[in-house]
Design a protein with these regions (language model features):
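The feature marks proteins involved in alpha-glucan
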Residues: 1, 23-102, 107-115, 122
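C-terminal accessory region downstream of the catalytic core in glycan-modifying enzymes
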Residues: 476-477, 530-563
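C-terminal beta-strand-rich structural cap/linker in extracellular carbohydrate-active enzymes
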Residues: 44-46, 562-585
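Hydrophobic faces of well-ordered beta-strands that scaffold small-molecule active sites
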Residues: 99-101, 138, 188-190, 262, ...
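Substrate-binding/active-site clefts of carbohydrate-active enzymes
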Residues: 104-258, 267-284, 290, 332, ...
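Carbohydrate-binding surface patches
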Residues: 1-5, 9-12, 498-537
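Glycan-recognition and catalytic regions of carbohydrate-active enzymes
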Residues: 409, 416-444, 463-521
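Conserved alpha/beta catalytic core and glycan-binding cleft of carbohydrate-active enzymes
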Residues: 66, 70-74, 78, 272, ...
């Protein structure tokens, strides 16, 4: 038998309806004030919950969900399946520096020629390549159950927090992915959406929480309406004990699969109860899992020290914005770039808590960042009104890929190398989207949340054309791994030295270049559209390890040539929109 435990404090009668028509009454908890109803169902059966004879509801802590053929968004017909969860396995943190690759569990393998393309099981064969280029963490977009009738590809409208989306596979499949990653000294993180649900507002469908205990699970305003700080119709009431228990039940269950880290979508919603956020931190310490916050929602921006628990890592949106601006040649950003390169000390006491990224699932891909000046979202069905207009991108002089001149494509490849260099040689924890390393594109769509098609599926054919870029990324990750200063827990402080082209750093509004020296690295970054001669201002037997400024699409930017810098004063020409990295032998 499988236990059924339901929170429905206002109910007079709660029953389980089994698929064969049998009804089983649940019993109110011995503490009648508790609001909990208890019972059990046979292993393997499909069942729904009935509250006071109302329509069938999905158990919010179901282990698996099944949808009838006549299921529709406007007339839900979904059933819990009493399937036992796999035997618990432990997390296993990587021994390597963290380099995070974000991917969609379905889209990553959808175009592979194999029977299980688009399934969790297919991910296992992608892990060796990722490991070989230095990715030590695969972060999967939401894998929990959502409504397949909703036209939502990303999965950010959850139905059951602790069940695996049935179109991707089973909990056993996910456990096998985790085990395979651990064998390669890799971690698996999953993106969890526990701040809102697929039930939307009062006009949305009722699947479970609204029919069980609406007032306890959702946050409401003074007029009784749903607070919509997630932009999806509702938010979980993070101050409510039943809602907190539901969140923790889902996390506990996924942690039992050996998941190594959880990235919390719109974590500022949970921070409405700071003590709850800290209790999640305590739980994570006991389970040995990492916590990563998207530290904002529509109402609050809690990046850095404003977030209520310093043990959480955070997506650093300021790194994204400042570095994108610098990359495209905006003036006046040198002071901001200096902060981002050294782990954002204005925001974080511990640099590795900063998840540095230029791209994520929402927004442009890395290639689209250098190929489009504006979003191209018409296919999403909102007349181009969805998605941000603040992309901070530059198309290198030509919009899109159709008919692109050769010299523009050369510049784009250089900009891609620049982007990866800035990302991977900054202090903090770098993240990029899997496919960025070989020029993945979404055709300029920066919000393809409902595009379950070639727009979002990984196009593996591009690997051949962008082989040099993939080799470059692997090489820069190797440079990163060889310089512990980039992955140390302590801030750089006074260990980093900053320079301009021929003296102290140029912090003027027109400046577009900066150099720095730390831990055996000397980096010269020129985002101006003309070349600049940099004077090497630290003596040593330097070698050029990286030069992004090649004028072909086949060069990978990895070089190895000596530079005489004894005494100080050697001049190195850094080309237009280029970066040169020196390493000490």
């Amino acid at each position: 038998m499988v236990e059924v435990r339901v929170w429905a404090p206002q109910a007079q009668v709660v029953e389980v309806q089994v698929a064969d028509g049998e009804r089983l009454a649940l019993q109110r908890s011995a503490d009648s004030a508790d609001g909990e109803w208890l019972g059990a169902v046979p292993d393997g059966v499909r069942y729904q919950l009935l509250v006071d004879g109302g329509p069938g509801l999905v158990d919010p802590v179901a282990t698996q969900v099944w949808f009838a053929d006549d299921h529709r968004r406007t007339a839900p017909n979904a059933w819990a399946e009493a399937v036992r969860w796999p035997q618990p396995q432990s997390s296993r943190w990587t021994s390597r520096p963290l380099v995070v690759g974000e991917a969609h569990a379905h889209g990553l393998t959808r175009t592979r020629e194999r029977p299980d393309a688009g399934k969790l099981s297919a991910i296992i064969d992608e892990l060796p390549r990722l490991s070989s280029i230095g990715v030590s963490v695969l972060e999967l977009l939401p894998i929990h159950q959502f409504d397949p009738a909703e036209n939502n590809y990303w999965g950010y409208m959850p139905l059951v927090f602790g069940a695996v989306h049935q179109l991707y596979g089973t909990a056993d499949d996910l456990a096998e992915v985790v085990a395979a990653a651990h064998e390669l000294d890799m971690e698996i993180w999953v993106d969890v959406v526990v701040n809102h649900t697929t039930e939307e507002d009062e006009h949305g469908p009722t699947f479970n929480l609204r029919g069980l205990a609406d007032a306890d699970y959702y946050a409401h305003d003074a007029d009784g309406g749903y607070i919509n700080d997630a932009g999806c119709g509702n938010i979980i009431d993070a101050t409510s004990a039943p809602a907190q228990r539901l969140v923790m039940a889902g996390l506990d269950r996924l942690a039992d699969l050996g998941i190594d880290g959880f990235r919390f979508d719109l974590a500022a919603v949970l921070a409405r109860d700071p003590e709850f956020v800290r209790s999640i931190g305590d739980w994570a310490a006991g389970r040995r899992v990492r916590l990563i916050a998207e530290p904002w929602d529509l109402a609050r921006y809690l990046l850095g020290r404003d977030f209520p628990d310093r043990r959480w890592s955070q997506w650093n949106g300021k790194f994204r914005d400042d570095m994108r601006g610098f990359l495209r040649g905006e003036g006046g950003l040198v002071p901001a770039v200096m902060r981002r390169v050294q782990g954002s000390p204005d925001l974080f006491d511990e640099p590795l808590r900063s998840i540095n990224f230029l791209t994520a699932h929402d927004g442009f891909t890395m290639y689209d960042l250098v190929a489009y000046d504006r979003k191209h979202n018409d296919a999403n069905g909102w007349g181009g009104t969805d998605g941000t207009d603040d992309n901070r991108s530059w198309n290198c002089g030509w919009e899109g890929e159709v008919g692109v001149p050769a010299e523009v494509e050369v510049l784009r490849r250089r900009q891609l190398r620049n982007a990866m260099t800035l990302l991977l040689l900054s202090h903090g924890t770098p993240m990029f989207v899997v496919g960025d390393e070989f020029g993945r594109t979404q055709g300029g769509n920066n919000n393809p949340y409902n595009q379950d098609n070639a727009t979002t599926w990984t196009d593996w054919a591009r690997r051949d054309d962008f082989a040099s870029l993939e080799a470059f990324v692997s090489g820069v990750v190797a440079v990163r791994a060889a310089h512990p200063v980039l992955t140390q827990a302590e801030p750089w402080g006074r260990d980093v030295e900053w320079f301009g082209a021929n003296g102290p750093p140029d912090l003027a509004p027109h400046s577009r270049s900066i150099a720095w020296h730390v831990g055996g690295l000397y980096v010269m970054a020129n985002m101006w559209w003309e070349g600049i001669d940099f004077t090497v201002q630290v003596p040593g037997a330097w070698r050029v390890a990286i030069d992004t400024g090649f004028d072909t699409t086949s060069e990978n930017g990895l070089v190895d040539r000596s530079v005489a810098a004894e005494p100080v004063g050697t001049s190195i020409s850094v080309g237009p929109r280029s970066i040169i990295v020196l390493t000490a032998p």
